[in-house]
UniProtKB/Swiss-Prot annotation:
Belongs to the universal ribosomal protein uS3 family. This is Small ribosomal subunit protein uS3. Keywords: Ribonucleoprotein, Ribosomal protein, RNA-binding, rRNA-binding. Part of the 30S ribosomal subunit. One of its GO terms (cellular component) is cytosolic small ribosomal subunit. Residues 17-86 form the KH type-2 domain. Pfam families: KH_2, Ribosomal_S3_C. PROSITE patterns: KH_TYPE_2, RIBOSOMAL_S3. Residues 222-302 are annotated as: Disordered. Transmembrane segments: none annotated. Binds the lower part of the 30S subunit head. InterPro entries: KH_dom, KH_dom-like_a/b, KH_dom_type_2, KH_sf_prok-type, Ribosomal_S3_C_sf, Ribosomal_uS3_arc, Ribosomal_uS3_C, Ribosomal_uS3_CS. GO terms for biological process: translation.
Length: 302
């Protein structure tokens, strides 16, 4: 759980630092940042359209920003590196801020959206998308989209290749969210392919002779490995067969129980035979007594 909380705190701190730079460097054309923890301190790379305004006269502004980072976000010795954005129209964050400012100045949203996305495509972008959400016109909020070219919405390319930028336009009716996505000109997409018209077929087709030689080498290597394995198996000492002639046979518990049951049955059988023999003797004695009584009665009658 501690690791999860640490990741959440790091993400929250990153978002807060990004918002801080967006507010402080709005006039300088803030184009995003990158954080990299190092043993010497936190390394921060700032991208701006006007690096001179970020640094300030004699480095006054950059020292002020460094002090605020240490006090507000508890960063130890932050090292700030300011880089100039070569093509502002291909930086999604700068484009989003520009579009938000145009909406605040009263530009109609369709004109602002089409003009902005046309400038992006003219700069060489492979694709772009602008999404305006909020009270664009009227009292009801809605979403307006402007698309050009090719854009990725999910998967690893959407995270690694597509440049994202967000801005907010504060209007009289309410706020309008601005979301910009741009695919730069030199992006390598996973589904790209190239057709070579003047390609030499011999360079692309595998030579059968070379393929056969490679296959023979592979088979020879497998045969050599098999021979080595057989040699190792032959070199191992043979285990002596176990001699069970002199060993005593140990009866299991089940065998002992079976013998005990047989003995018990035999004893019960003997007891039953004794009981039946006693009954036979008693019956014989009783029969003899009856015969004697009958003889006595016959004698008395005569």
């Amino acid at each position: 759980m501690a690791d999860e909380l640490e990741f959440i705190e790091q993400g929250l701190q990153r978002s807060q630092i990004d918002e801080f730079f967006a507010e402080e460097l709005a006039r300088a054309g803030y184009g995003g940042m990158e954080l990299a923890p190092t043993p010497m301190g936190m390394q921060i790379v700032l991208k701006a359209e006007k690096p001179g305004m970020v640094i300030g006269k004699g480095g006054k502004n950059i020292r002020k920003i460094t002090t605020q980072l240490e006090e507000r976000f508890d960063l130890e010795d932050p090292q700030i590196d300011v880089q100039e954005v070569e093509e502002p129209d291909l930086n999604a964050q700068i484009v989003a801020d520009r579009l938000a400012n145009a909406l605040e100045r009263g530009w109609y949203f369709r004109k602002a959206g089409h003009t902005t996305i046309d400038r992006i495509m003219e700069s060489g972008a492979l694709g772009a998308e602008i999404v305006l959400s909020g009270k664009v016109t009227g009292n009801r909020g809605r979403v307006e989209k402007f698309n050009r070219g090719y854009i990725k919405h999910n998967g690893e390319p959407a995270e690694e290749i597509v440049d994202h930028g967000k801005g907010v336009a504060v209007m009289k009716l309410g706020t309008i969210g601005v979301n910009v996505k741009i695919i730069p000109p030199n992006a390598e997409l996973p589904d790209d392919f190239e057709i070579q018209e003047d390609a030499d077929i011999e360079d692309l087709v595998v030579d059968e002779a070379e393929a056969g030689e490679d296959l023979e080498e592979l088979l020879e290597g497998e045969d050599a490995d098999a021979e080595d394995a057989d040699a190792d198996a032959a070199a191992e000492p043979e285990s002596e067969p176990a001699d069970f002639e002199d060993e005593e046979v140990i009866e299991t518990d089940d065998d002992v129980e079976e013998e005990l049951d047989e003995l018990a049955d035999a004893v019960e059988g003997e007891d039953e035979d004794d009981e039946f023999s006693d009954v036979d003797d008693e019956a014989a004695d009783t029969a003899e007594d009856l015969l004697d009584e009958m003889d006595d009665e016959d004698g008395g009658a005569e």
